[in-house]
Amino acid sequence: MATSANLDIGAQLIVEECPSSYISGMPDIKLEHQLDPNPDEGAAQGVAMGMKFILPNRFDMNVCSRFVKSLNEEDSKNIQDQVNSDLEVASVLFKAECNIHTSPSPGIQVRHVYTPSTTKHFSPIKQSTTLTNKHRGNEVSTTPLLANSLSAHQLAAQGEMLYLATRIEQENVINHTDEEGFTPLMWAAAHGQIAVVEFLLQNGADPQLLGKGRESALSLACSKGYTDIVKMLLDCGVDVNEYDWNGGTPLLYAVHGNHVKCVKMLLENGADPTIETDSGYNSMDLAVALGYRGVQQAIESHLLKLLQNIRE
């Protein structure tokens, strides 16, 4: 099983433990020094295109390479199962649990650890007990008393439109961020609340805002395959190649989640399939390594169209 000590992949994101998930013009990255860093989220701002930072605790993409090379070996089945398990635990999308103390590179800001759940669907966003119960089906109904005690972010995640609208009108918290820099829009996008996302966008929510780890509403939606939300965000003109703290782009997250429709939509809207991780792997490499034939075919088809357009 892969450990957090060899986490080395250029894409990671996203959503199930809720907040308390590129570039065509890469913005400046500020690297903050910390005197007493904790062995947390595994590292700082990701990179894209020509710029590279050495980030500790990142998933080694050689695992993907080993997976591909093993397909023709006699014991490929056992190796494939092991590597699939490695990819699930130390995946592109999720900040892995880290129990090993490392020495971060100078200038790299280290954040606290997000502990993954025992399922394959977990994320860096911490969920409250209320949200956890909702997903487990333990919550029968939401009483006015309970709804009034929830934050705007939790209301957005649960789809409590009426209470959320009232809260925003009274307190003007439509772009308010929690301790991780997540906005109500990001919470709604992460939980597939289509109506809430539409409501927030229509009432002034900023889809361009990023979390402390550069997480975006688009990446959060792509990681779960919420195509309707992805389309709404793309229609707002968000950066389709935005990268997060781990170098992950919306396309890489959609590829990792095997969300073919999202992959096609992103490619049609200018997502760059050639953006590579620090280890030199792009979205096609990841699709092949994970055995996602549908995603692979979607990328191949897009690249062929690009080549045909160039020839014409």
Swiss-Prot record:
One of its GO terms (cellular component) is cytosol. The keyword Repeat applies. It is a peripheral membrane protein. ANK repeats lie at residues 147-179, 180-212, 213-245, 246-278, 279-312. It is found in: Cytoplasm, Cytoskeleton; Membrane. One of its GO terms (molecular function) is protein kinase binding. GO terms for biological process: regulation of protein-containing complex assembly. SMART domains: ANK. The ankyrin repeats, mainly ANK 2, ANK 3 and ANK 4, mediate interaction with a wide array of PxLPxI/L motif-containing proteins including HDAC4 and LRP2. The PxLPxI/L motif of interactors can contain a Ser or a Thr residue in position 2, which phosphorylation prevents the interaction with ANKRA2. PANTHER family: ANKYRIN REPEAT FAMILY A, ANKYRIN REPEAT FAMILY A PROTEIN 2. This is Ankyrin repeat family A protein 2. The lineage of its organism: Eukaryota, Metazoa, Chordata, Craniata, Vertebrata.
